[in-house]
Amino acid sequence: HDMMSGSFLFPPHNPENDIAILFIETSGCLPMCGHGTIGTITIAIEEELIQPKVPGKIRMEAPAGVVEIEYHETNGKVEWVKLRNVKSFLAAENLTIDCPELGEITFDVAYGGNYYAIVDPQSNFTGIQDFTASTIIQYSQVLRERINLKYPNAFIHPENDTIRDVTHLLWTGDPLDPTSSG
């Protein structure tokens, strides 16, 4: 269940905000979770677990910071949710790590509420289209651990030292459909 997550709702610390959310997964607590935010806000609005100060807008506290959310509701159902996440930044470029099955992999690390290692297509990784989801998950677990061992204390948020280490891997590839976008 490495890819599953959950959330706990709390009253906000700052009364200007609507809610505080703590995200959890098998590795522990996450500073932020985009898909978790969308799902949690959807159910919290539909089940009337929160009463936003401004209809259609929510200010949410997460360990990573305040996230601004907009949503649209019709007949008690949330139709869409969009969020403005915490500030993101590039933390490192062109790092390398040995992947037992693939050999040396080059990757970048970016922050967007969590630290993500980003693996683009390269000579020994042609893209996600050539791998099963379970294989990518397996590689991700191994590489996450290896990255944090090889680069100890390299990924610590400059404003919150409790946010540290690569917690996610993002594998990319070419679009499967040339008309795809996004």
Region annotations inferred by a language model:
Residues 1-32, 39-182:
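Active-site proximal loop and beta-alpha junction motif in alpha/beta enzyme cores
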